[in-house]
């Protein structure tokens, strides 16, 4: 008789604890898996993802110093070039609309082929689209697969040339010169009254902004108000040579700036992903332990109930 009373009390105690666990599950929105095995598999998957994001953050951090050096080096050349155009008072010429509706502007949009770096590519695509609202007939050259895929959705007819294989490493002048040569030979870039380069400018280690950089063609350079103040040989090819060099150099500057912004954005994105994965691991670890406790509780109830019936 005494053993039966003790057994009944133990049964009521275990069943009460089981009911409390069940109430806890109903109020916990994290619990989306019915079995212990599913929760365990989910937890293992999140831990594997956390390892990947942490590794990618470390890789991005090591590349960031190299990207910063490339950005600073390109910026020095850009500052010297901008000083020349400032002293020459060079500005884009006002071009009236043509009767045939021919493109008045060439847009060069620069990103890379890689993702997992936040909204850096989509933000640049939005900036290009806003610019196209004012210049719907502009021709577009995309550098990098990401910007190409973004603009193909809305402006497929404007894209005339696409270049990929960009962003694997810090850009060099040789790389930018090859791209500039392709723009001159394939797109006849020198015939456009206006050329605009769109790229991502790193404002700080945590932020960036899409920027636009104008490129002056040979005719614009030659007609600069103060261009004659410089001691230049009588060679008629000087404005053209200066334009071609400027195109390559500005491409390098934009690519270096964009590369640094992308690496920084990827590091921040992977850092946030690692933190989110850590939070999910904590939540699912609690869920796993509670689910496991519920399984043990059910087994205890079955054992005690069976013992009571046998007694």
From Swiss-Prot:
Transmembrane segments: none annotated. Keywords: ATP synthesis, CF(1), Hydrogen ion transport, Ion transport, Membrane, Mitochondrion, Mitochondrion inner membrane, Transit peptide, Transport. The keyword Acyltransferase does not apply. Its main location: mitochondrion. One of its GO terms (cellular component) is mitochondrial inner membrane. Changing residue 297 to A: In ATP3-5; dominant suppressor of the slow-growth phenotype of yme1 strains lacking mitochondrial DNA. Residues 1-33 form a transit peptide. It is found in: Mitochondrion; Mitochondrion inner membrane. GO terms for molecular function: proton-transporting ATP synthase activity, rotational mechanism. It is a peripheral membrane protein. It holds the Pfam family ATP-synt. The keyword Nucleotide-binding does not apply. GO terms for biological process: proton motive force-driven ATP synthesis. Belongs to the ATPase gamma chain family. NCBIfam families: ATPsyn_F1gamma. F-type ATPases have 2 components, CF(1) - the catalytic core - and CF(0) - the membrane proton channel. CF(1) has five subunits: alpha(3), beta(3), gamma(1), delta(1), epsilon(1). CF(0) has three main subunits: a, b and c. Mitochondrial membrane ATP synthase (F(1)F(0) ATP synthase or Complex V) produces ATP from ADP in the presence of a proton gradient across the membrane which is generated by electron transport complexes of the respiratory chain. F-type ATPases consist of two structural domains, F(1) - containing the extramembraneous catalytic core, and F(0) - containing the membrane proton channel, linked together by a central stalk and a peripheral stalk. During catalysis, ATP synthesis in the catalytic domain of F(1) is coupled via a rotary mechanism of the central stalk subunits to proton translocation. Present with 28100 molecules/cell in log phase SD medium. This is ATP synthase subunit gamma, mitochondrial. It comes from Saccharomyces cerevisiae (strain ATCC 204508 / S288c) (Baker's yeast). The lineage of its organism: Eukaryota, Fungi, Dikarya, Ascomycota, Saccharomycotina.
């Amino acid at each position: 008789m005494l053993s039966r009373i003790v057994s009944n009390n133990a049964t009521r105690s275990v069943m009460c604890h089981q009911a409390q666990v069940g109430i806890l599950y109903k109020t916990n929105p994290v619990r989306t898996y019915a079995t212990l095995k599913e929760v365990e598999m989910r937890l293992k998957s999140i831990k594997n993802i956390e390892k990947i994001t942490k590794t990618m953050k470390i890789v991005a951090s090591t590349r960031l110093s190299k990207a910063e050096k490339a950005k600073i080096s390109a910026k020095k050349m850009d500052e010297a070039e901008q000083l020349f155009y400032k002293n020459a008072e060079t500005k884009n010429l006002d071009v009236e609309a043509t009767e045939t509706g021919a493109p008045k502007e060439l847009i060069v949009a620069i990103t890379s082929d890689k993702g997992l770096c936040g909204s850096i590519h989509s933000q640049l695509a939005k900036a290009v689209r806003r610019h196209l609202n004012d210049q719907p007939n502009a021709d577009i050259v995309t550098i990098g697969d990401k910007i190409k895929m973004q603009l193909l959705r809305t402006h497929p007819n404007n894209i005339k040339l696409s270049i990929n294989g960009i962003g694997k490493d810090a850009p060099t002048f040789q790389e930018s010169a090859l791209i500039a040569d392709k723009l001159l030979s394939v797109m006849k870039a020198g015939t456009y009254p206006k050329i605009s380069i769109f790229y991502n400018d790193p404002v700080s280690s945590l932020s960036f902004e899409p920027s636009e950089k104008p490129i002056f063609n040979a005719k614009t350079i030659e007609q600069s108000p103060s261009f004659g103040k410089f001691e230049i040989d009588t060679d008629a090819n000087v404005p053209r040579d200066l334009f071609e060099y400027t195109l390559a150099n500005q491409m390098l500057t934009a690519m270096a700036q964009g590369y640094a912004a992308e690496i920084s954005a990827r590091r921040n994105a992977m850092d946030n992903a690692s933190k989110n994965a850590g939070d999910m691991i904590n939540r699912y670890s609690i869920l796993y332990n509670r689910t496991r406790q519920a399984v043990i509780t059910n087994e205890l109830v079955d054992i005690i109930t069976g013992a009571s019936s046998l007694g």
